[in-house]
């Protein structure tokens, strides 16, 4: 729950709903952060549809004020520009932001019944920026591991 909180008047505010802000780059090198409200009620494909629709509206200047308010956690994707890593600044009052790098194929060593084997796998670097007043390194690392496991065991019907 700490990841989905905010700091208001120096107090931690816990949020029941997950409202994901997603950074969208605009043609003039500016940025806008539309929000997928109540993301916990959608499966991954529903999130993708909603994110795509919001990005199109953002780039065409057709977002409403409600579309850019109320985020509780933010995603940014410098990987879309080819970057392997990105260190994003927290979108306050959120206490965390997840940055996704470009997907690339890499050799990965896996243990098998026959010993170690090398496989080619798609990989992506994740970077979590967080407010150290609320989240420490151990908590942030556990969150990243849970995201990693979710992605490695991906099922498009699962809710977030």
Task: Briefly describe each language-model feature range.
Residues 1-160:
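C-terminal catalytic/motor cores of large multi-domain enzyme assemblies
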């Amino acid at each position: 729950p700490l990841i989905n909180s905010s700091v208001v008047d120096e107090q931690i505010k816990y949020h029941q709903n997950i409202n994901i802000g997603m950074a969208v780059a605009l043609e003039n090198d500016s940025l806008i952060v539309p929000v997928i409200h109540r993301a916990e009620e959608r499966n991954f494909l529903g999130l993708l549809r909603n994110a795509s629709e919001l990005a199109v509206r953002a780039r065409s200047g057709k977002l409403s004020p409600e579309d850019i308010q109320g985020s509780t956690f933010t995603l940014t994707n410098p990987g879309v520009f080819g970057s392997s890593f990105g260190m994003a600044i927290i979108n306050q009052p959120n206490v965390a932001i997840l940055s996704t790098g470009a997907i690339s194929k890499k050799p990965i060593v896996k243990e098998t019944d026959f010993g170690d084997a090398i496989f080619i796998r798609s990989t992506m670097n994740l970077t979590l920026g967080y407010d150290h007043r609320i989240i420490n390194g151990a908590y942030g690392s556990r969150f990243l591991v849970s995201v990693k496991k979710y992605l490695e065991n991906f099922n498009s019907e699962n809710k977030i």
